Amino acid sequence: STPIKSSAASDVYKRQNQYQLNHSRKIHVYDKDYKYDYQKIKYHKISFTPWGIYDSDKGISLGTFFTYTMYGFKRAPFTYQHRIGYNYLKGFMYAGVFPNYDGRRRLYLNASISSPRNFENFFGFGNNTAGYKEEKKNYNRVKLRTYMFNPSFEMDLRKEEVMTFFGSLDMYKAKRTDDRYIYTVYGEDHPIFRTNYFVGLGATYRITKQPYSWLPLLETEWTAGWKMNLKKPERNFPYAQGSLSWNVRFSDRFTWASLMKATVLFDNDYEFYQAATIDLRGFRDNRFIGKQSFYQYSDLRLDMGKLKNPFTPLKYGLFAGFDYGRVWFPGERSHSWHTSYGGGIWLTFLNKFTTKYSWFGSTDSFRFAFELGLGF
């Protein structure tokens, strides 16, 4: 996995009422949710969301999460929010959001405890690693026990700019299994099979624009950070990430969405689960890892409208996608770029829950996935 998972941004909502006066003049009245108003009703909201996935790489994993949102006298747009979830494969997760009353600053607390079934794929380092197609999928799987705590503080600099400062305290322990590929790379007494603690610091700068009606999203994000092994402080590394994403609207129903992302590690003292990787949808997770990575994926999306039925509002659409990317690793000479291609269908019901079916192929094989829910 990539070395940093940034917190999701939280929108700030403002109610705007417009009144018509004499002489065709207009005034705008804003109700600022973050101001104290004793007439506001104090209440809380509890919601439940199913969450599941079937993936030809990961297998089946079902779960759910509960969201508790408190609306006090001061809101931006709420007073605070807790989300607690469990997934059969990933384990327990918690996400807390605590916005400042002016709506311009937010504190995030994220934590997770992996389940005993949690794993990551490991195929070795480099851009030319073998796919081990003749082996069973378990051969490249590594059971990984993790505990993570990741606080972050986010502030709005200007209307379209957000700055996030984050920290991390993580624990990893890879399970030693004799008949797995990892055992051929790391010796029996290698520290990778012991409990390792890591501390990290970093910052992310994000710009999100909506410049034109035909370009409703243009976003760039830059991250710089540093991680250190607490048991072996000499094993530490700085890193940087950058991404650029956009949506182009050709019509009300036809859009093009794309994301480019690059990762650079500035030292060699990292573990395989901290390496730079590429998310190509036709390959297994972490199929290629290294010291630097770059990839781009793009989708053409067609909104097919609504399906009439007597039970629930149902929207659906089609998409086709193409991905490419590669990694770089010291001492390896490779000119290969990896590609994947495919498509699928998505369904939204109750205007809230989404299911997505996708199929993507590559030089290794193909990957089929079915997703349900909103994600965590």
Identify the residue ranges that each predicted region occupies.
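Outer-membrane beta-barrel "beta-signal"
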Residues: 347, 365-376
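Extracellular/periplasm-exposed beta-strand and loop segments of Gram-negative cell-envelope proteins
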Residues: 53, 120-126, 135-146, 176-182, ...
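Single conserved hydrophobic/aromatic residue that forms the stacking wall/gate
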Residues: 2-9, 13
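Flexible, solvent-exposed coil segments and beta strand-coil junctions
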Residues: 40-47, 69-77, 126-135, 177-189, ...
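Residue-level detector of the transmembrane beta-barrel scaffold of outer-membrane proteins
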Residues: 49, 77-79, 106-110, 162-166, ...
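C-terminal outer-membrane beta-barrel translocator/porin domains of Gram-negative envelope proteins
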Residues: 44, 92-93, 139, 186-316, ...
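Transmembrane beta-strands of outer-membrane beta-barrel pores
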Residues: 52-59, 68-70, 82-88, 111-119, ...
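Outer-membrane beta-barrel initiation region
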Residues: 14-110, 164, 174, 178, ...
